[in-house]
């Protein structure tokens, strides 16, 4: 590059991190790495045209344990339900905001999941590929249980952490999932 243009590259860093293969080199030059994450609920609200003063009012009510005005409460419940279905992936959110077509939203979500699975096949070591994919595909069942602790027996009957823990770690390292550790509500 001769410096006349800024170039932005995106994508999986699994190949660069060296999963399953010798680490590949990163092009030399001015490089800034920015870790990107899905939109959180507040960002989802912004994308849906909810302005900052409204969000601040909601935060103030919640922080001070005050009643949220009825109209705001109704709208936030609706948006929270939509967020739980749409999620925070930018392309999915943009499609939802611009079209409100759930069939298009679901197709983009399926495409994202397929690309995650393709990365597993491309970058994981051969001996780990099936276990990683099994762990990944068990996530919906894991999340639908009342007990939210990851249970290896749901991945495969009789399975243990010693067999699958590395697979789950691979999925987290890939940025596909992130662990949430809950603590008891403090009163």
List the predicted regions and their residue ranges.
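Structural recognition of the conserved hydrophobic beta-strand(s) that form the central parallel beta-sheet
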Residues: 6-12
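Conserved nucleotide-sensing/catalytic segment adjacent to the nucleotide-binding pocket
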Residues: 1
């Amino acid at each position: 590059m001769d410096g006349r243009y800024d170039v932005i590259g995106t994508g999986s860093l699994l190949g660069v991190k060296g999963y399953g293969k010798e680490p590949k080199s990163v092009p030399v030059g001015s490089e800034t790495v920015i870790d990107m994450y899905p939109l959180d609920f507040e960002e989802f609200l912004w994308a849906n045209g909810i302005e900052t003063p409204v969000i601040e009012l909601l935060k103030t009510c919640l922080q001070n344990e005050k009643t949220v005005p009825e109209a705001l409460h109704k709208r936030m419940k609706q948006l929270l339900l939509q967020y739980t279905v749409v999620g925070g992936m930018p392309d999915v959110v943009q499609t939802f905001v611009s079209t409100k077509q759930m069939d298009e939203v679901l197709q983009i979500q399926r495409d994202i999941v397929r690309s995650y699975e393709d990365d597993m096949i491309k970058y994981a070591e051969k001996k780990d590929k099936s276990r990683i994919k099994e762990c990944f595909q068990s996530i919906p069942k894991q999340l639908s249980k009342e007990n939210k602790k990851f249970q290896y027996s749901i991945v495969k009957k009789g399975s243990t952490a010693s067999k699958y823990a590395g697979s789950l770690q691979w999925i987290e390292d890939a940025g596909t999932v992130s662990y949430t550790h809950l603590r008891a509500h403090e009163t």
